[in-house]
Every structure is written in C-alpha cells, then in structure tokens.
C-alpha cells in the first residue's frame, strides 16, 4: 500500500510540476505578445483594430461572414452611414 501511495504521490508531483512549468511558459508568451503590441503601438498601429483582426482570423470563414452580415444589418437598422451612401 505504501508503495502505491509513493508512486501515486510521485505521479501527482510530476503532473503539478509540469503544469507549473507550462504556466510559466504561458506567462512568458503573454509577455512576448505584450511586447509585440507595444512595439506595434509605438510604430503607430491601432492595437484595438489589430486585436479585432486577430479575433476575426481565428474564426472560420462562414462564421466570420455571418458576423459581418449581422454587423452590417445592425448598423443599417441604427441608421449608421456607409461609404457610398
């Protein structure tokens, strides 16, 4: 029984340590992403728009098209002006 508990405890410790390492790597990646956004902002890029583009690029084409159609419909319903109108 003690051997089983020892093995189980070692397994648990290994999982915890792996998760902790991955969490640190995640923080490091988030820091790098923040640095890239800061550099882009320093060069005059609009960060909010960049984040929107990244979010849209993650979507599948059909979902993105559906969202754009709904956005257009809502804008028209609110009487928002469009180019060419």
From Swiss-Prot:
Example GO molecular function: DNA binding
Pfam families: GapR_DNA-bd
Listed InterPro entries: GapR-like (IPR018753), GapR-like_DNA-bd (IPR046367)
Transmembrane regions: none
Family indicated by similarity: Belongs to the UPF0335 family.
HAMAP family listed in its UniProt record: UPF0335
Protein name in UniProt: UPF0335 protein WP0746
Species of the source: Wolbachia pipientis subsp. Culex pipiens (strain wPip)
